[in-house]
Amino acid sequence: LPVFTLEAQEGRLFKPLAFTKTFAMFFASFLSITLAPMLMVLLIRGRIQPEARNPVNRFLIALYLPVVEWVLRFKKSTIALAVGAMILTLPAFQRLGSEFMPPLNEGIIFYMPTTLPGISVTQAARLLQIQDRILKSFPEVDWVFGKAGRAETSTDPAPFSMGETTVVLKPESQWRQLPADRSGWPAPLRPIGDLLLGKSRPITWEELVAEMDKALRLPGVANAWTMPIKNRIDMLSTGIRTPVGIKIFGPDLQKIEEIGKHLEMVLQTVPGTRTVYAERVTGGYYLDFELKREEIARYGLTLGDVEMMIETAIGGESITTTVEGRERYPVSVRYARELRDDVDQLNRVLVPTMNGAQIPLGQLADIRLTTGPSMIRDEDAQLSGYVYVDMVGRDIGGYVEEAKRKVAAQVQVPTGYTLSWSGQYEYMERAKERLAYVVPLTLLIIFVLLYMNFQSVAKSFIVLLSVPFSMVGAVWLLYFLGYNLSVAVWVGIIALAGVAAETGVVMIVYLDEVYERRLREGLMSSTGDLYQAIIEGAAQRVRPKMMTVTAIMAGLLPIMWSHGSGADVMKRIAAPMIGGMVTSTVLTLAVIPAIYALWRAWGMKHSARGSGLAGGRSERWTLK
């Protein structure tokens, strides 16, 4: 249910997975009560061997009996150990970072350098050539294609100061090998690690990008690294092309630029900042022609004559089309570059008059360079400016929280101006807000379903304890693997909660079945009888539980060694389920019997008091 409530890109990514599991569970349930019984009748022939004679079952029960007997002797200690494990997990949980989604490796690096507004075409072309040459020097790079400027379409609003370079990589099998660092290993284990894992390892994606970023730290250029599809989605969703961005809203562009520059200086001091760039909203350069109407009239010219000369000689005019085979190209005419590349040359451009005279343009207009907005952003009916922040080595949530504290302490935002944190952080906050009320609602629905099944609040609560206890293993495995909390991780945790609750239900059903049967047979007169019933019921659950864990582990462990596109997302889903199944097994086989014993013993004690009977205590705890 929580996955179906996700929206936007996270919903499109994970809803198919949820639909697949839902349909699979539905048809599996349907077939288990229709096809499976029929096949059992047809295929299971001859004498059926009792479970007590099954060697696997006998082996598992032999291992489990000492455990459950110890648990029933030290019930409170067992529960205390479980609670202590949960408490010890809290620091690890708090140290987990947060992000929207793990990086989805597309196999292509998208490099987006940003310069100050006003860069010329010649400078931009030269800069692209230098950057492409540096990128192509890396042995992992197959080919590089860079561009500056944009197409004449509203779907590509990139300014000329923002370049885009596509870096296509070779297959990972052809990447460089680096020495494996095992300095943190104990000295006796290092040779074993070299023997089993090898003395070298391939360079990682993050290390390759870090080397490229270091090689491309050019003066006046702010680097941003992403991937093509991810970049397009981010740009269309929020307009921010980096993991984190700040949108500044206000009535005056000049003030917005000042706030952006101040934010740029402050954010550079935040640990984990790779590059930060505030848009120079008013940093565009313009060539202004202020026409002298009296001078134009004195020479018998009109404003249109002068403007046409400026447009044709300087901007160029298409006069014809040349046909080259099946191809056609427009032919434009304008002054040579050396006659129009500075203001002095423009002042010498000659404007013909009706009587054949040639008048310098400088006598008919004042020509000067001015600055102004390179582009005007408007969002939510307000002027805006963006600050782009590219970060490395930190989780997005932790970085933004620290950055917010520094900005609040060092940046004074004037009245009428507001800051909005955007980028992937905006997605993360949106998903977090949605899950914050959907997950508790889902747990409430599960509790209601459990109560409808058991008709007991106590049993329902015992089953729900499976969820927090299963989180212990999930959190610790995430911590050791260095994974951040993300939507993918929460999807795995939600799936883990369902499996943990399911195994808890089966354990309670087995314990109840033996308890009720012995109660009907009159064999429930003491706590010793209760413990023997619990041992018998729990022992019946060992093999099904181990089969469930083995099947889930067999299906999930290969994901942890997978590579390629999508592997990083799938690992985040599988990791909490793998870690959680370990602690869920301990809970089901140890903690639930202890809690069940305390609850039933308390009920028997009060029942005995009400009937005036005294319950004895038997030490006969062996399974017959």
Language-model features, listed with the residues they occupy:
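Transmembrane alpha-helices and their membrane-interface boundaries in multi-pass membrane transporters
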Residues: 1-6, 13-51, 165, 469, ...
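Signature of alpha-helical transmembrane segments and their immediate interfacial
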Residues: 1, 52-102, 135-136, 142, ...
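Transmembrane helices with small-residue packing motifs
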Residues: 3-13, 48, 83-119, 170-176, ...
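Hydrophobic transmembrane alpha-helices and their membrane-interface caps
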Residues: 5, 23, 31, 445-541, ...
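A short beta-strand structural signal in non-transmembrane regions
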Residues: 112, 165-167, 176-185, 190-209, ...
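Interfacial helix-loop-helix hairpins and adjacent transmembrane helices
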Residues: 9, 15, 34-86, 117-123, ...
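Extracytoplasmic/periplasmic membrane-proximal domains and adjacent transmembrane bundles
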Residues: 224-226, 245, 257-260, 264-442, ...
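Solvent-exposed, membrane-proximal periplasmic/extracellular interface segments of envelope transport
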Residues: 122-236, 240, 265, 294-316, ...
